[in-house]
């Protein structure tokens, strides 16, 4: 079985920065640290409202990321234009609503095949590999094939949010069947959304999975595992100032 890749989403480094309108913490530095720690790629979502990652972030990250850059974006002319200019290695096309806290579901590719085909084609023409963020649904998988996308990313939110063991097992089975179906259609299969240190392994064990994109859980864990060192460093500086 091939190695499973990890794409680290660093959006919430930018969320923390923007909460105070400062220049830190820096997503560019976070990307470097993640890569040094073994991340196989860096994912950022340039939202239409620019609530976390900014255009400037995207441009600098494209120049500095040493692995692979995956740009998540809505299917709009503006975003496709930006992607065609910056040329990330990958683009993941996602649905987007201004009021949502995070992406709430998969793209309805089947309901807008012509629009998706046009976007996928424009991105592919400049050498960008395209993934479509969809629910674990055979109809959407068929539509992704029709649109010409080489990759899909299966939305794992329902699996992550399941409130009982039986619900989670049912969602896992749905994802597993979708992954097998998609791989049989020649698609590369990624997955993401809501994956944590407690629920990732059953998804990671699915043999068709090529890459998992995980962000919030990793950034949250980083706060916890790095908090002691950060407090110690600050205390050292304060003590040194009084010497």
Swiss-Prot record:
Q: Which ranges form a coiled coil?
A: none
Keywords, sorted A to Z = Cytoplasm, Pyridoxine biosynthesis, Transferase
Acetylation in keyword set: no
- Part of which pathway? Cofactor biosynthesis; pyridoxine 5'-phosphate biosynthesis; pyridoxine 5'-phosphate from D-erythrose 4-phosphate: step 5/5
Which Gene Ontology terms cover its molecular function? pyridoxine 5'-phosphate synthase activity
Cellular component per GO, a single term: cytosol
Positions of the catalytic residues: 45, 72, 193
- The EC number on file is 2.6.99.2
- Site feature (Transition state stabilizer) residues: 153
Extract the NCBIfam families matched here.
pdxJ (TIGR00559), PRK05265.1-1 (NF003623), PRK05265.1-2 (NF003624), PRK05265.1-3 (NF003625), PRK05265.1-5 (NF003627)
What is known about what this protein does? Catalyzes the complicated ring closure reaction between the two acyclic compounds 1-deoxy-D-xylulose-5-phosphate (DXP) and 3-amino-2-oxopropyl phosphate (1-amino-acetone-3-phosphate or AAP) to form pyridoxine 5'-phosphate (PNP) and inorganic phosphate.
Family membership noted in the UniProt record:
Belongs to the PNP synthase family.
From the Swiss-Prot or TrEMBL record, give the protein name: Pyridoxine 5'-phosphate synthase
**Species this chain originates from:** Yersinia pestis
């Amino acid at each position: 079985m091939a190695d499973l890749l990890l794409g680290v989403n660093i959006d919430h480094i930018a969320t923390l920065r923007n909460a105070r309108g400062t220049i830190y913490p820096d997503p560019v530095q976070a990307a470097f640290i993640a890569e040094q720690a073994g991340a196989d790629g860096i994912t950022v979502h340039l939202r239409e409202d620019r609530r976390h990652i900014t255009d400037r972030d995207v441009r600098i990250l494209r120049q500095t990321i040493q692995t692979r850059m995956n740009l998540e974006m809505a299917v709009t002319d503006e975003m496709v234009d930006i992607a065609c200019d910056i040329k990330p290695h990958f683009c993941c096309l996602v649905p987007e609503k201004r009021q949502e806290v995070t992406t709430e579901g998969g793209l309805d590719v089947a309901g807008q095949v012509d629009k998706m085909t046009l976007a996928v084609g424009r991105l592919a023409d400049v050498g960008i590999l395209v993934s479509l963020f969809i629910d674990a649904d055979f109809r959407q998988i068929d539509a992704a094939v029709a649109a010409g996308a080489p990759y899909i990313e299966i939305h794992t939110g329902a699996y992550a949010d399941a409130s009982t063991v039986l619900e989670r097992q049912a969602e896992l089975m749905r994802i597993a069947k979708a992954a097998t179906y998609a791989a049989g259609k020649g698609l590369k299969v990624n997955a993401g959304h809501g994956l944590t240190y407690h629920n990732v392994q059953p998804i990671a064990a699915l043999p068709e999975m090529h890459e998992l994109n995980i962000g919030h859980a990793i950034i949250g864990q980083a706060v916890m595992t790095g908090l002691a060192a950060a407090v110690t460093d600050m205390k050292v500086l304060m003590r040194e100032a009084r010497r």
